[in-house]
């Protein structure tokens, strides 16, 4: 079973380290993680690159979002941008927030549920 996580991020430098480490330290790794950098103006992109440099299954792509503020719109557009950039099909696609900290066996549990 192939599982991909898409994580839209915007100015998450205060949270991204713990989030990335919680994904990297999973008992079962996802097949791919795509961070969609949605025009961050802080060090979010650099931190993602630094913490994930040894994980070839973690990628970051840049999305140029519109400046117009409509609550919830930017994150949906960033997620859809990530979906459009998938090169292969996945059985499960998850959308997580950039500040999420996952329990160590979270991905394993997700895969097990879908395999039942």
Each predicted region: which residue ranges?
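Cell-envelope/extracellular polymer assembly enzymes that use nucleotide-activated donors
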Residues: 2-4, 32
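Conserved donor NDP-sugar-binding/catalytic core segment of glycosyltransferases
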Residues: 101, 105-116
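Short beta-strand/turn micro-motifs composed of small residues
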Residues: 7-9, 37
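Short beta-strand-to-loop acidic/aromatic patch adjacent to the donor-nucleotide binding site
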Residues: 89-101
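Active-site nucleotide-sugar/metal-binding loop of Leloir-type enzymes
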Residues: 76-92
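A short, glycine-/small-residue-rich helix N-cap motif at loop->alpha-helix starts
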Residues: 66-77
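Short, well-formed alpha-helical segments that are part of the catalytic scaffolds
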Residues: 12-25
């Amino acid at each position: 079973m192939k599982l991909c996580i898409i994580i839209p991020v915007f100015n998450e430098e205060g949270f991204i380290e713990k989030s990335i480490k919680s994904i990297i330290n999973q008992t079962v790794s996802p097949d791919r993680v795509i961070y969609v950098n949605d025009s961050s103006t802080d060090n979010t992109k650099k931190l993602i690159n630094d913490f994930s440099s040894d994980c070839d299954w973690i990628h970051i792509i840049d999305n140029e979002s519109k400046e117009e503020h409509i609550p919830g719109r930017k994150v949906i557009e960033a997620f859809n941008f990530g979906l459009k950039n998938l090169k292969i099909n996945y059985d499960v696609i998850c959308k997580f927030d950039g500040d999420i900290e996952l329990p160590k066996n979270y991905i394993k549990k997700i895969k097990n549920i879908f395999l039942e």
